[in-house]
Amino acid sequence: MLKLVENVVERVSAEEQKPQEIQVPQSSIDEELKKIVEQIKARIYVVGVGGAGCNTVNRMMEVGVTGAKIIAVNTDAQDLLKIKAHQKILIGKELTRGLGAGNDPKIGEEAAKESERELREALEGADMVFVTCGLGGGTGTGAAPVIAEMAKKMGALTVSVVTLPFTMEGIRRAKNAEYGLKRLAKASDTVIVIPNDKLLEVAPKLPIQMAFKVADEILVQAVKGITELITKPGLVNLDFNDVRAVMKDGGVAMIGIGESDSEKRALEAAEQALNSPLLDVDISGAKGALISISGADVKLEEAQQIIEYVTRNVDPKAQVIWGIQLEPELEKTIRVMVIVTGVTSRYITFQEETPEPSEEEVPPVKIDIPEL
């Protein structure tokens, strides 16, 4: 058996060094199979809403997300002009005249409703829709729940991926975020919550501008990681129906990311992911988990260690799905991203809905920004 393994390794290594194109005659069945594959391919759309959401999709265009349509939505024409996307939608042209929502979620909501027809046309045919935004402002907080509700009613698996504002951004933005998150959770199948404050636990001396960039990058990694497990050829891919099974009516979800290049890199990366400050919940009751493993040369034994570690820490009845993406640029590093669904979060309590904040309720607050 060992000799067989050695022979395979030797042959594959030689083939990689001297790739040879094998000429295979094309048949009519091949053409038919290609058409079928194209027809059944999951159509995945990523919608960035508001300033932070548009920054996220702009970054996605830079790094590339295989097999996803990128849509940027904003009320601010000037900001939208700078964004790269497959499609841009300026919402609320009559209401805001392209000047933004002024940190008022109600204006963001009404702007989305005004542009409902254009938004519906953009979402037409989607199997899965990611709605991403930074909560706390006007456009993302107000418009994202409207867009998520549209997508879900149109039959798409709807996953919202959002950040919560830093405490230093003030009480008004915190109240806006609380209101928006409750509405978004009700409008989506799953809402993945990333508390920005937790980034400061990872790197307390991070400059504020860089902290926002890191928050954007985590949003990108979450959406890209899930999408490419479905769309990008990898060592182990996920079927769209696998993802649907975990994220359909998944409720609140949290994300953890870990990586290591040590001798025990697989276990260390898994431990880091589950102990990540971003994973700010007790995951023992999680109803589902999606594991994305990335590396240049992930071994079967390492994948098994990661999956077993995560499985031991969630509900025994939880549905756990996983995939492996080969990323040569990671070299000796293994990266593990874990998204746990169906968790109880202190960020969302479905009691009486918090009314949207107004100028009278939340006076301007002067915040002394600490040195980071």
Curated annotation (Swiss-Prot):
Q: Which HAMAP family match?
A: FtsZ
Which residues are listed for GTP binding in this entry?
G51, A52, G53, C54, N55, G138, T139, G140, E169, R173, D216
Key word Protein biosynthesis present: no
Role, per record: Essential cell division protein that forms a contractile ring structure (Z ring) at the future cell division site. The regulation of the ring assembly controls the timing and the location of cell division. One of the functions of the FtsZ ring is to recruit other cell division proteins to the septum to produce a new cell wall between the dividing cells. Binds GTP and shows GTPase activity.
Name the UniProt record assigns to this protein: Cell division protein FtsZ 1
Enumerate the residue ranges of region (Disordered). 351-372
Provide the assembly information.
Homodimer. Polymerizes to form a dynamic ring structure in a strictly GTP-dependent manner. Interacts directly with several other division proteins.
Q: What is the lineage of its organism?
A: Archaea, Methanobacteriati, Methanobacteriota, Thermococci, Thermococcales
Q: Which UniProt keywords apply?
A: Cell cycle, Cell division, Cytoplasm, GTP-binding, Nucleotide-binding, Septation
Q: Which GO terms describe its biological process?
A: FtsZ-dependent cytokinesis; protein polymerization
Q: Name one GO cellular component term.
A: cytoplasm
The entry's family comment says: Belongs to the FtsZ family.
- A Pfam family of the record is FtsZ_C
Subcellular location(s) per record = Cytoplasm
Could you state a single Gene Ontology molecular function term?
GTP binding
Organism name: Pyrococcus abyssi (strain GE5 / Orsay)
Where is there biased composition of kind Acidic residues? 353-362
